[in-house]
Swiss-Prot record:
Record-given protein name: Ribosomal protein L11 methyltransferase
Gene name of the record: prmA
Subcellular location: Cytoplasm
GO biological process terms held by the UniProt record: methylation
Family assignment from sequence similarity: Belongs to the methyltransferase superfamily. PrmA family.
């Protein structure tokens, strides 16, 4: 089978939105090449070794590569992707050039080459995220492993917003907590919450591909006795109270449901949000406070923030 590599030149702010559009269009895998990875300072508190080749990164902006099987409808698929990307500026998301290029890739090349982008990454004191094909031995008895299959959808869960959400969960989840994960994607946050001692986690996503991906990853991590996955639009029709809600979504989506979050999370419960570019921290904080939340802590990583807020 022949494959097409669709490359989109965009901005760091648009990475999650463009990646989601590509997954929605049926991409069999997505890789992100961000030149900021070459120069950023790294904590290296877990003994990581980084081997990055500058020749594989664009001079500026971010390059997102997605892989589609060559079919008669590929041109229509690409046109649909372009149309969806062109709409993003109306949501105040800067897309940069938005240039799209297409290259042919042999199946045998695709089957192995894309895996070079994914390796075990220890993202916190507790968790290491490991691609399913990698063999990995925990460095201590307390280290927890989350296995993910990036080939299914939604990457490996190592984006700064996901990392901050997991670190926020480490700070806040108590044994026996009831939790809702809004916009679960790969299910990584729900899996983390279950491994931290939650007694029940409801994971929701509007995208049926995300639901399928999350269900697979939940089973893979043997947390399906705690995590239930379902299709739903944000918190529509969801009743509480729960101890904690976590949502790693675009800022524009988070702004749609602070009042619903305040309705569903118990008094004194927590709402953890990320997916927020730093420039939009203020507008999200104000919306949460207007809904009755108090901002307890703001986590920062690169150009992103995560907010831990407590309900009145």
């Amino acid at each position: 089978m022949k494959w097409s590599e669709i490359s989109i030149h965009t901005t760091e702010e648009a990475v999650e939105a463009v990646s989601h559009i590509l997954h929605e269009a049926g991409a069999s895998g997505v890789a992100i090449e961000d030149p900021a990875e070459l120069t950023k300072e790294r904590e290296q508190q877990y003994g990581e070794i980084y081997a990055l080749n500058p020749d594989e990164y664009p001079a500026e902006g971010v390059l997102i590569k997605a892989y589609f099987p060559q079919t008669d409808s590929l041109h229509e698929t690409i046109a649909g992707v372009k149309s969806s990307i062109d709409v993003l500026p109306s949501y105040d998301i800067e897309i940069g050039t938005g240039n799209i290029t297409v290259n042919e890739v042999n199946e045998e090349d695709w089957a192995t080459a894309w895996k070079k982008y994914y390796h075990p990454v220890q993202i916190s004191d507790t968790f290491t995220i490991v691609p399913t094909w990698e063999e990995y031995t925990p460095s201590s008895p307390d280290e927890k492993i989350i296995e993910l299959d990036p080939g299914m959808a939604f990457g490996t869960g190592t984006h700064p917003t996901t990392t901050m959400c997991i670190r926020a969960l480490e700070k806040t989840v108590q044994p026996g907590d009831n939790i809702i994960d809004v916009g679960t994607g790969s299910g990584v946050l729900s899996i983390a919450a279950a491994k931290l001692g939650a007694s029940s986690v409801q994971a929701y996503d509007l995208d049926p591909v995300a639901v399928e991906s999350a269900e697979m990853n939940v089973r893979l991590n043997k947390t399906d006795d705690i995590v239930s996955v379902g299709q739903n639009s944000l918190l529509e029709g969801i009743e509480g109270p729960v101890d904690l809600i976590v949502a790693n979504l675009l800022a524009e989506i988070i702004l749609l449901f602070p009042e619903d979050a305040a309705r569903v999370v118990k008094s004194g419960g927590l709402f953890i949000t990320s997916g927020i570019i730093a420039a939009k921290e203020k507008v999200i904080s104000e919306a949460l406070e207007k809904a009755g939340f108090t901002i307890e802590e703001v986590l920062r990583m690169e150009d992103w923030v995560a907010i831990i807020a407590r309900n009145a």
